[in-house]
Regions:
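Catalytic cores of DNA base-excision repair glycosylases
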Residues: 3-162
């Protein structure tokens, strides 16, 4: 059995399959990926649901007052993430006419979107090839390949899988 088949089989048996952001909506994927940075899933779920009630789409987020965005973010910490969300929502609204870019280069050029977040948006929202290299993925791949969790060594080792 291939490595990818083993991972998919494990995920089907033990993974989280009913999270509110598991959708092909790039806005929902993006917001969840930003919230999940340095924050556990169980903590994020109620914040995500409340945030979506206040800002159900990129336009409402872009038109919101920053203080309102920060108020909705209160309790999650790392407030720079909320500021970047707000700034990026404005860019997507103004420069991309509320349509998320569907290519890596445009995504990583946006404030607060790095390699892993761009990979998640591409893979989950657009069904395109994208590498999601968060802490959990790094841990699993480094154990499977018996590679030190050294970022540059791990990136080289994971390339054939992405």
């Amino acid at each position: 059995m291939k490595f990818s088949e083993r991972i998919i089989e494990w995920q089907n048996l033990h993974g989280r399959n009913n999270l509110p952001w598991q959708t092909n909506d790039p806005y929902k994927v993006w917001v969840s990926e930003i919230m999940l940075q340095q924050t556990q899933v169980s903590t994020v779920i109620p914040f995500y649901e409340n945030f979506m009630k206040s800002f159900p789409n990129v336009l409402t987020l872009s038109k919101a007052n920053l203080d309102e965005v920060l108020k909705n973010w209160a309790g999650l910490g790392f407030y720079r993430r909320a500021r970047n969300l707000h700034q990026t929502a404005k860019i997507i609204t103004d420069e991309y006419h509320q349509v998320f870019p569907d290519n890596y280069e445009d995504l990583v050029a946006l404030p607060g979107i790095g390699e892993s977040t761009a990979g998640a948006i591409l893979a989950l929202a657009f069904n395109k090839k994208g590498t999601i290299l968060d802490g959990n993925v790094k841990r699993v791949v480094s154990r499977y390949l018996n590679v030190e969790n050294n970022p540059s060594e791990l990136k080289k080792s994971i390339k054939p899988f992405s």
